[in-house]
Structures are given as C-alpha cells and as structure tokens.
Amino acid sequence: MTKNKSSEKFMIGYIRTTLLPILVFGGVSGVLSGLVVWGFKWCASYLENESVQIYKWFRLNPTFIPLLFAGLIVLALLSAIMNKAIPELRTNSIANAEGAMRGMKRYNWVRTIFGTMASSFLSYTGGLTFGAEGPSIQLGSTIGQATNDFGHFIEKGSPAWERYNVTGGAAAGFAVAFGAPLSGILYTLEEAHKRLSPMLLMTAASSVFFATIVSQSIGDLVGQSDYFLQIGTLTLMPYKFYWTLLIIGIACGCLAALFNTLFAKTGELVREKLVKIPTWLRIVFIFLLTGVVGLVFVDAIGGGHRIIQGILNLDFTWQVLLVMFFVRFALLIITPNSGAMGGMFVPVLTIGALVGGLLGKAFIAMGLSSEFYQTIVLITMTTFMGATMRAPLTAIVLVVEMTNNYFSSFLSTGITVMIAYLIVEALRIEPLYEKALMDSFKNAYKGKHRKVYEFSVVVEKGSFVEGRSVKDILWPYGCTIVNVIKVDDEGNKVDTTDKAGDRVIRAGQTYTVKAFVYDELKAIEEMEYLTKNYSVRETTELLKRKGFGGILLRRKAKTNKKESDGANGAVDSAFDAERKNFETQEMPADNKEIREQVGNDEKVDSDKQ
C-alpha cells in the first residue's frame, strides 16, 4: 500500500513538474512558431521570386540598370543599419540559435524577431544567395525564449526551462521551414546539443507537433503543399551500380572539407585582416556583386530552391551546371561573411544538388540508366549537407521528408554519408557553424579570459533538478559535475562520481561543479536556477578565496517570502559575520590541479596587462 502511494505521488509530481510544463510551453511556442515561421517562409518565397523577375526586367531594359544598382545600395545600407543596431544579426542565424540552445547567449527577443525578419527580407529582395530556413530556426528559438520569459509569471522555476524551450522553438522553426518534423527534432539533438535525453526529446517533439499542425492547417487552407521538393517516384539503385556511391562519397567528403575550410578562413580574413573595412561597405559590396551576377546569370542567384527543382527536372545542361556550381560556391563563401542576414541550409543543399547533377550526367554518359538521375542528385545533396554540417542522420531524414519519398531504403544514402563523414572526420574539419559560434562567443567577452573555477551547490527539495538524472539536465555552458556528496543510510557522508550521468538527483546532495567559463557569477546564477527551490526566498553570497581563482558558493538564511524587512536585515548581518569567518580560513589542500591552472591563467592575464 505504501509502495503504491509512493508510485502515485511520483507520477503526480512527474506530471506536474515535467509533462505539464513541456506540453504548455511546447504548445505555446509551437503554435507561435508555426504561425510566424509559415508567414516568414511565404514572404521569403514571394520576395525571392519577385527578385528574379526584377532582374529579368532590367536585363530586357538595360537603360534602367543604374536604377537597379542604386536600389541595391539602398537595400545594403538599410541592412547595414540594422546590423549595427541589432547585435543578434551580426552572427550567422544558425550559429545564434545553436548558441542559445547551448546556453552561450540570450536574445533580446523583441528586436531579434523584428530584425531577423526585416533584414532577411532585404537580402531576399536583393537576390542574395540566402535561404529562409536558417532565419526560421532563429525565429523559432527566439519565440521559445520569449515563451519562457512570459512563463516567469506563471511558473516560478521557468529560468531552468529556458534552454529546453529555446530548443523546442528551434526544432519547430526547422520543422515548419522544411516541412520536416522528424528532422527538426533530430537537428536539435544531433547538431545543436550533440546528445540525447528524454526531456530534450519530449520538449522538441511537443513544439514540433503543435507547429506542424498549425503549418499544415494553414497550407491546407491556402492550397499550398508542405513538401519542399516536388518529385515523382524514385528508382531503387541496384547493387551492381554501388560503385557510383564510392565516387559520390569521396567527392562530397573532399568538397565539404574544402568548403568548410574556405568558409572559416574567409571569416578569419574578414575579422582579422579586413577589420578596418566597415561592415556597411562589405554589405554594399556583396549586394552589388549579386546584382552583377543577377544581370549576367539570373538562374544562379537566390536561395536555391528553384535551382534544386530545376536540376531534378533536367532543366540545365552540364555546362550550365558547372558554371553555376563555381558561381554559387564562391558566393556562398563570401556572402555570409559580409554581414548580410540570411540562411545557409538550402544554399548548401543547392551545392550538393549541383554536384549531384554533374555526377549524374557523367554516370549516364558512362552507361548508367537515366532513371537513376534523380536518385543520384538526392543522394549527393544529402551527403554534402551531412558532411558540411556534421549531422548525417539529420541530413538523411531531411531529404526523405522534403521529398516524401523513401528512396533507396536508406542503404545507398547511408553508405555515401558514412564515406564523406569519415573523410571530414579524418581531416578534423569543424562543422560549418562551429567556428562562427565560438568566435561570436569570444567577442561577447572581449578582454576577458576563460578560467577554471570550482564551487559546490546543495540540491534543495522541490528544485528543478530533484528527481531527474544528471544527464537529463542542461547544465550551464562550460560546467561539469565533478563529484557528488550524499548521506548514506547510516548518516555518513559519501563522496562519489557519476561519469555516466545516470544517477538520480536527490534533495540534500552536494554537487561539486567544475566550470571553465568567462563569468563565474553567471555560471553560479544559472546553477541556482536548477538547484534552488523557488518557493523560498534565498539570499546568495559569492565569496572569493584570497589567492585562489575558484569560488565557493555560500548560501545562507532561508527566509519565507512573508517575512519582514527586519528579518532580511538579520540575514545581511549573518552574511557579514560569515564573510569575516570565511576570509580568515586557509585554502584547503584539495583542488590542486584547478588551483595551479587558474594561477597560471591569472599570471598570463597580468603579464598581458
């Protein structure tokens, strides 16, 4: 009977503290993301199509070409003004979203939503090689944070939910942008967090579920298909032609390594060597360059959806595909590093489709049946994207969902993706957005240096982490649980480790945290959101040891919210007394490794100063 009551109590608590918040937050952010991203995607598609028509009109009326370039300069200057006014627009939208999901940054969500949409529309109008999918993910993640911020009014512990809700919003944005719900969930787990946990999975799935319902409902009302690409039934490739897969895998792996390297080097060149060139001038240059390309080769501009569909429909000769490949490859390396706003998912897929079109035509010339052409194009798209993003599962599932076609039963695609992935892994090529994310993270703390700190926190009853496993928690960025101190049945303190992260967190346990961060106070504050019971008012004091780079968290004097200000004054007096006692203590003999590392960091910092 007691056991049944305990199980019933656990289930009620689980529903109240986990399932209900996931459904509520996921439902709100999913519905809002579905509405906003669907509208954004529709506007982006309209502007891109109109941009192509504008370029075609100027080609037929060359007398007015100066007006075209004047208009492009105006668009570029407006984009530069927004770039300067809104910091969230200075970094790639995917890198921004992944940074928010990992806890490396927060949005000012009002200006981010407005700025992302407006600045992206300027890029699409100018014909830049940007897609709508990257900004859609940023919009979704921003809406997730906004939902969480409003949740402060209804859920006391909502700061602890922030990264989960941001993840759910990003997954919803991805799902609506591509019409690929499963890929949206996979993307956040494989690419953003690089981990799988039940809470992350449920949060992402909840948001994606509601966003997909909204998106498909709107699509049904206006008669618009949710599928990204429109193709017929694909032909399964026989085993005797699997030699083509080896060529595709090697070609995509080498090309992805080259692309990621050139993209990263170009970004370094802009930030380090060309830093004196103002951002507005770089943006004006890329708009004008796109204008020249649009007048000469209008099929090569835009996000790339038209190009992919045209390649699948055999609309281009191999000569056109070859020229388009070099033009798009160069533009895609330069454009995102200029400071203009837009996404890279579809442009990257377009590069893969162009390579697939060229290889497909080459294989056909070598005797392969033309019925396998579309299959080769889709396999190459998947492989190139999986290699550049370092997200093979997401790439495979994405192409299947975009086409609504379960081609080649995953086997042929899995082979090529594996080959390409092994190549970029062997060459130690960073994922496409990783470098941009880390650079923006460092710039946010310019003048500071990351140091190692160690502090302890006590888990309170009713806190966010209580009853959950260590691996299920999104701990503050740069923080690792070193060991756990708990009290056994006999009342003795036991010091243990939990490398697998399977241990269930209980109230009263003390967790030692090792943090490699720029701002130790911020790390402590975020840890408090997780381990603190918001039903009680607590005053937190952070004390720094003399000659020690680490910090120790001292939490004192829990007081009820209804206690008077006089009681709060007593709390302050208790802190003053504690500080005097603490500062006279000697440094403990443990933490030698951390103490030495921090000492070296501080010495380097003082030498630099």
Each model region followed by its residue ranges:
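Long, low-complexity, intrinsically disordered segments
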Residues: 572-609
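Low-complexity, charge- and small-residue-enriched intrinsically disordered regions
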Residues: 277, 432, 550-571, 576, ...
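Alpha-helical transmembrane segments and immediately membrane-proximal extracytoplasmic
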Residues: 1-445, 461
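Short, solvent-exposed beta-strand edge segments and adjacent coil->beta transition regions
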Residues: 452-456, 508-510
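Short, surface-exposed ligand-recognition loops at beta-strand->loop->(often short) alpha-helix junctions
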Residues: 457-465
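A generic structured-segment signal
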Residues: 24-25, 472-475, 595-596
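Long, charged amphipathic helices and adjacent flexible linkers at domain junctions
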Residues: 433-452, 536-545, 549
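Cytosolic Rossmann-like ligand/nucleotide-binding regulatory domains
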Residues: 466-530, 536, 540-545, 552-558
